[in-house]
Amino acid sequence: MKELKYILLALILFPLMGMVSACSSDDSEEDEYANWQERNDAVVNQWSNNSALRKIKCYTKDQTTGGTSNDYIYVEVLEEGTGTESPLFTDSVWVAYRGRLIPTTSYPDGYVFDQSYSGDFSWQTADMTQFCTGALVSGFTTALMQMHRGDRWRVHIPYHLGYGSSSKTSIPGYSNLIFDIALLDFWHPGETRPEFKSREI
């Protein structure tokens, strides 16, 4: 009878332990993005007050007024190129990029949701991706239209200039976006696409 009692007890406890484990996992995932909109709003305010970041107003916003902190992207220049021209809205570009969310407990450097290269960036080894300048979120497009060939920027984009309240695969709604962008080259409609392999800046 004692053996039967222990068997019955084990059958009762094991499912409960599984439920506790599952609940703990769910709670952890939920906590990762708890108060997500408020946290992202607070980060934008920090960017806005950081004098080390260059403020560039989004091309879609009224350029004659000051606007709000959500109307701007905030740029840290990692490398300055030698180019003097910038891509137009209708141009195509060769870029390398890495996109992250704001830091969280599990991802202190920010969760990487997309990237065209792995490891440390190198002009010689990074894979370049072709985009149409105007086909991206407005914050990314704004950055490209201010960059020159050879520039590498870290661009902080408020969610208002990203995907807004919408979720995109691994990007929750109300997510600010942080992109490392390297602009190798660009060309106008009708021009021959330049090659990028083995090129040096």
Residue ranges and their predicted role:
Residues 18-22:
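C-terminal motif of bacterial Sec signal peptides marking the signal peptidase cleavage site
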Residues 2-6, 23-201:
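Cross-family detector of peptidyl-prolyl cis-trans isomerase
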Residues 7-15:
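Sec-dependent N-terminal signal peptides
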